[in-house]
Amino acid sequence: MKPSSPISLTSSSIARKARFSPYLFTLLAFILFVSVLYGEDFMCIFGQLEPNFVLPPSRTPEKNKKSEKLAFAIGKTEESCDVFSGKWVRDEVSRPLYEEWECPYIQPQLTCQEHGRPDKDYQFWRWQPNHCDLPSFNASLMLETLRGKRMMYVGDSLNRGMFVSMICLLHRLIPEDQKSIKTNGSLTVFTAKEYNATIEFYWAPFLLESNSDDAIVHRISDRVVRKGSINKHGRHWKGVDIIIFNTYLWWMTGLKMNILQGSFDDKEKNIVEVSTEDAYRMGMKSMLRWVKNNMDRKKTRVFFTSMSPTHAKGIDWGGEPGQNCYNQTTLIEDPSYWGSDCRKSIMKVIGEVFGRSKTPITLLNITQMSNYRKDAHTSIYKKQWSPLTAEQLENPTSYADCVHWCLPGLQDTWNELLFAKLFYT
């Protein structure tokens, strides 16, 4: 279609189109309202679509902005400050934020020093945004904010690692007889009795009901997700004040995903195959609907953590074929690096679904910054749940865990970003 000249509109042509103006005005007003009110959080998502995407500074005059103060916010960041865009800086003074031996809550799958990792280099890196500084993590402020409240991480084992990291960052300020941790099925609850506060983790790798919902036995190759079933888990999330969702890796079983239409109790199950992107889109829409129906935007905060990268293919960063995260002690220095495991098609789905939603939700855009950290995985330095074979012992790359992260380590920075976005919008 040939574009119209910018000066070709005559008074008659304007008159002919005048009957459309109310609809056009309404549409433009709505777009402007959403972009101003939630622009920061949604645009973080769009920035994720391309690793080198840089958000332009807002040109909207401050006096014309219609802002809504988010719950728990105590300040604002500079408009030019994108805390998710930056570089890793060596810091042996303020890192690590705690020692592995100081935190008894770290699971044996994440205690790399205890399981023989010979170096500590991965612990001495601090995230430095390009145009600003991250606010220092203030454990006292976090605990006082959580007084009488519930914070919950919902998702898979990567979100569980972030949950454990938060406990490690806070527990030293709580007297020994005033804290406890208990697991019941999918729910693990850390209680700070003195503060009448809980920090919780709920196992739901797809957020929706699935055949992988058992918190212990869930290694199922033929995964099935039930459509429209988020309330199966969501009833356990009601009443939470701060909630952090994640879901990604469990959807990545190939190009297709099995979706159950009906119930797992049906004798004849109606299971259909859909593209991974369409299945993930269904999950994102379900999550946003649940948030809209169950979270009070004036009193609560909702976060979504973007995909956590793996480093299973050394050729991605110029390594040898067959190489992975095993024995990696240096960072990836290419600022544009994007691992092949991070599907841009999925990030596009997130951008589309979140961008069309009016539900306020803050994206924790940890993907790019974590892409550089091939050194920070647990690798072989973790508890092995079954005896290693002679073949595995001869080839450590064959059983290296390039999904999960050592603690203390990278996931402490994820919580620093959560702290920054919670208190400084």
Swiss-Prot record:
GO cellular-component term (any): Golgi membrane
Transmembrane region(s): 27-47
Subcellular compartments: Golgi apparatus membrane
UniProt motif (GDS motif) ranges: 155-157
Cytoplasmic-facing ranges: 1-26
Locus of motif DCXHWCLPGXXDXWN motif: 401-415
Main location per the UniProt record: Golgi
Tissue-specificity statement: Expressed in inflorescence stems undergoing secondary wall deposition.
Signal peptide: none
Gene Ontology molecular function, alphabetical: xylan O-acetyltransferase activity
PANTHER family per the UniProt record, alphabetical: PROTEIN TRICHOME BIREFRINGENCE-LIKE 33 (PTHR32285:SF62), PROTEIN TRICHOME BIREFRINGENCE-LIKE 9-RELATED (PTHR32285)
Assigned protein family: Belongs to the PC-esterase family. TBL subfamily.
Biological role stated in the UniProt entry: Probable xylan acetyltransferase that plays a role in xylan acetylation and normal deposition of secondary cell walls. Required for 2-O-monoacetylation, 3-O-monoacetylation and 2,3-O-diacetylation of xylosyl residues in xylan. Required for the formation of 3-O-acetylated, 2-O-glucoronic acid-substituted xylosyl residues. May act as a bridging protein that binds pectin and other cell wall polysaccharides. Probably involved in maintaining esterification of pectins.
More details: Contains 2 motifs that are conserved in esterases, but it is unlikely that this protein belongs to the catalytically active pectin esterases.
Name by which UniProt lists this protein: Protein trichome birefringence-like 33
